[in-house]
């Protein structure tokens, strides 16, 4: 009888470890997807910045800016004026089988800030957030790059 009890506890332990492994794998997938999405946005900005003059560079970087206000995954402000950036940001919220979107991500959980001041060195910061139904607070991925 005790042997059966010990066996059952062992089986339940193995099932619990399997569930934990699946959860960790899902978390890793979302972190990887978030890193890839922020990298895609940074690459787009690097490739499409107009570097012909300093004024043109500043203007194009400013056009990439998206919801520069707010903090902690509750962003606000004007949307980006660049259609390519908006298309990439839309991929973040497009969730479904075979789609790269992040669960719980909305338009208000994405931000691109640009600092074109002399002290900012054309710093671009891209933040995207997502939240699983089991998460108490949103998770985020932030990538910082400089455009010269």
Task: Name the predicted role of every residue range.
Residues 1-18:
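N-terminal single-pass transmembrane signal-anchor helix
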Residues 2, 23-148:
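Flexible, low-complexity segments enriched in proline/glycine/serine and punctuated by aromatic residues
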């Amino acid at each position: 009888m005790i042997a059966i009890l010990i066996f059952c506890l062992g089986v339940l332990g193995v099932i619990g470890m399997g569930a934990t492994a699946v959860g960790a794998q899902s978390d890793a997938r979302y972190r990887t997807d978030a890193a890839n999405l922020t990298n895609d946005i940074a690459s787009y900005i690097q490739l499409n910045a107009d570097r012909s003059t300093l004024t043109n560079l500043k203007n194009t970087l400013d056009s990439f800016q998206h919801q520069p206000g707010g903090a902690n995954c509750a962003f606000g402000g004007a949307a980006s004026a660049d259609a390519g950036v908006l298309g990439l940001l839309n991929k973040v919220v497009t969730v479904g089988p075979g789609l790269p979107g992040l669960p719980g991500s909305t338009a208000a959980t994405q931000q691109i800030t640009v600092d074109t001041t002399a002290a900012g060195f054309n710093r671009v910061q891209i933040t995207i957030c997502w939240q699983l139904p089991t998460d108490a607070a949103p998770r985020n991925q932030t990538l910082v790059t400089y455009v010269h």
